[in-house]
């Protein structure tokens, strides 16, 4: 089955693409290569197992050049919290307007299945176990952009009968992680591999949830 994967050349997206191929699907990769890397998917494209379009999801006209597929997996986003602080308008354009463009693309192409990549960041500084009904309190522009994306997804589901799932992954780690956005596990491993002790801030008692990129990739195929 052909499946559009936005952000498919990125850290998580390239793993989703790889898993789709292993499950006999044909990914249509959409990426503007702002943070994604073509080398992550080149072997799949060269071997004819995937197709690549260098398209920015903010460009509605170019999006309409994409083929109709049974489903869309939407990962394309600015994932840096720091960038959302420094350049909130840009992050809003990509994460909010870009998501709206993808939903509208699906409506126009009559694509009913849509998976949106949200974030556990929408819960804010929540210090207890969270679930689907936990109150959302976003405290960054990035988190707010993801929650807004979820709200647009609900509207399109209600109005147009789209079958939409929103995933809320927490801190993802694993191969191909962008050095600029590397999480604490990557930074710990980099220092340990160079025979330096990891840098631990505070008293070391803070906790954080992590998930390996292979596990989150599987979640998109459930």
Segments (PLM) and residue ranges:
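N-terminal Rossmann-like NAD(P)+-binding domain of SDR-like oxidoreductases, especially those catalyzing
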Residues: 1-172
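NAD(P)-dependent short-chain dehydrogenase/reductase
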Residues: 128, 151-208, 213-222
């Amino acid at each position: 089955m052909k499946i559009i994967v936005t952000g498919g050349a990125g850290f998580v997206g390239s793993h989703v693409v790889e898993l789709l191929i292993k499950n006999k699907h044909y990914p249509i990769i959409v990426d503007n290569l702002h943070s994604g890397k073509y080398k992550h998917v080149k072997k799949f494209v060269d071997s004819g197992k995937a197709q690549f379009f260098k398209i920015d999801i903010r460009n509605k006209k170019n999006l309409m050049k994409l083929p109709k597929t049974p489903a869309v997996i939407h990962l394309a986003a600015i994932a840096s919290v720091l960038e959302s602080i420094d350049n909130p308008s840009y992050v809003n354009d990509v994460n909010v307007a870009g998501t709206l463009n993808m939903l509208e693309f699906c409506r126009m192409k009559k694509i009913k299945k849509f998976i949106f990549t949200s974030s556990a960041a929408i819960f804010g500084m929540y210090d207890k176990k969270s679930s689907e009904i936990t109150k959302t309190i976003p405290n960054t522009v990035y988190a707010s952009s993801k929650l807004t994306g979820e709200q647009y997804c609900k509207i399109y589901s209600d109005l147009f009968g789209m079958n939409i799932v929103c995933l809320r992954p927490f801190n993802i780690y694993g191969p191909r992680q962008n050095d600029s956005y590397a999480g604490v596990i990557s930074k710990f491993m980099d220092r340990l591999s160079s025979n330096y002790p990891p840098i631990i801030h505070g008293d070391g008692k803070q906790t954080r949830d992590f998930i390996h990129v292979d596990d989150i990739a599987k979640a998109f195929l459930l």
